[in-house]
Structures are given as structure tokens and as C-alpha cells.
Amino acid sequence: MRRENPMSALKPETHLETHDVTNQPPPFEDVNLFETDRALCDAVESAGGGMHRERLSAFGVRCGSAQVAEWAMQANRNPPQLRQFDKYGQRLDEMEFHSAYHALMDFGIGAGVSSAAWTAKQSGEVLHTALEFLMAQAEPGVCCPMTMTYAALPALRQQPQIAAMWEPRILAAKYDPSSQPVANKNGATIGMAMTEKQGGSDVRANTTHATKNTDGSYTLVGHKWFCSAPMSDAFLTLAYAEGGLTCFLVPRWRPDGELNAIHVMRLKDKMGDKANASSEIEYHGAWAERIGEEGRGVRTIVEMVHHTRLDCILAPAAYMRQALANALWHTAHRTAFQKKLIDQPLMR
């Protein structure tokens, strides 16, 4: 039976045949990432989020734990794999993730990273910001689907009848990785796909087109060069309808219980962010629902984009904080020239 945390359960051997291993800092783990960050504590307080301190402290303990550090390492060492077809040649378009990835997603979503901004009675955005900042220090890759799920809600609310299906599952703070129609799930994640090969950030150069069906739904044909978190339950996307560039919600499963025609062509080969899947997709007559008015797609989807930008700013700040915390931990535990490194003149 596999241990929950095999690396931390092993006691390293320090007495080797040729030498003793000494003067090494202990692992940077079992540290409260919230309480040890005075700047973050002060910022939460000054922004009016003091009522969330106990919750953030508990989350900081988990984020700095040996268990979460082990999950993060395993999720990055074992990146997601794309299964386009099953052994019989039938189309799947499924992502396979290491169990550590699912553990991190369950941990973060369960703590409210993707929902707290909307469910907290006071200072929800302050709470979300602090949760995201801490989660990004623990493992930043899983923050991508959590961020998009959090950010999708303002856009979805522009179409109340669609939001009625998705909002309760976004706010439930439950992670459900199963691939099935959202009506059968207690929790849901939302992705985003805008960029195409020929246009990049110039989304008005897109060529994906949408044809309106008699029941008011749409059929999409085209491609997206960058689709983050392709295992999401639905995606906000852009396509040209008769009235112009329009925002649509494209679920992985159609209302009739069949897989939607979203083909995952390949996963991106990235320098970092290995735990998270980023992909290229094609719509082969994909079923979609319109969000907002035809011709106002950019204005509609920008509601989601604006909220993701906040978290995009948080991520590098979290990386810098984690780098600083690790450096200070190292210098506090390692000695050179009869002094701790932190007491040397260069550190003063």
C-alpha cells in the first residue's frame, strides 16, 4: 500500500561511508504560510478582511504542510497525458492526471479558492486574493482552473437561465473530476478558449463561426490555439455569429447526454506549469449556448478576463514571496564561518 507522503516519511541517511552530511537546512515544510507573512497579514487587515484571519491561518498551515509539498512535487513530475482515443479507436479527448493533481484540486476548491469571492458575506474579494496568493505558493498550476472558474461567474450571470445551472456548482466548493453531464455533478470548473493561430491576442481576427439552431442554441466550427484546462466542464469562447463576434458557453457534454464535438488536438509542451494542462482544440460542430448579445462577445467575455488578470498579478507576487521565504529559511539554518548565513554582513 502506497504511503500518503512517502518522501516525508523517510528519514534521510546522513552518515555515509565516505563522509557525514551536516550543515543542511531542514525541509521548508510544516510552515504556516499566512502567519509567517507579515505583509500579507497586514494587507488583509487593512483591506477590511480581518474577519477571515482564522480561516486564512488554517489554510496557510495546509499550504505550507509536508503533504501539500509532496502533492505539488508529484503533480509536476507526472504531468497530464492526453487520451484522444480508446483502444477501439473511439474518440475520448480525455486528460489523465496524477492522483496528486486531483488531491491539490480537491484541497484548493474545497477551501474556496474558486468560490469564496462570491460566497463570503464580507470582503469576499480580499479573501479570494489571499487564498489564491497562498495556493500559488503551494502549487501554481492548479490555480489556473480555479482562477477561470472564479472569473467565469460574472460573465455567466449575463445569461440568468444559463447561470442557474452552473452557478450552484461553481459556488459549491466541491471538486468533481468525473467526465459526465454537469446536471449529474455537484461541482463544476470552467475554462476559457479565445486565441486562434492567425490572430493571437487580436481576437477580432478569429475565424471560428457559429450557426444558430432552431431551438436557440448554436453550432460552432473552428479552432482555438490555446485552451487552458481542457478537462473543464465548460468553456467560455468566442465565435462569429450573424450579428458579429459573440461569446458562447461550450459544455463538454451536450444536453442529450452525448460528448460535445470538442476535439483536443494536443497538449502544449511548456517550460513550466507542468501540473496544469494547456491545449489546442477544434470545434467540429460543437453545441453551444450564447452568453450576452450577438456582436458583443468581447465586452461579454472581458468580464471573465478582468477577474483572471487579478490572479495573473497575484501569481508572480506569490512566486517571489515563496522564493524569499525559502531563501530566509535556508540562511537561518546554514552556517558559514562560524555564523548563520542570516547573521553575515551581506544579510544585515
Put a short name on every predicted segment:
Residues D256-E258, E280-T308, A325-D343:
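A glycine-rich, basic-preceded beta-loop-alpha segment at the flavin cofactor/substrate interface
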Residues R2-K121:
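Extended, charge-enriched "interface" segments that sit outside catalytic cores
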Residues I162-T208, K212-G216:
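Internal maturation/activation junctions in enzymes
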Residues E258-H284:
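Flexible, small-/acidic-enriched active-site or ligand-binding loops
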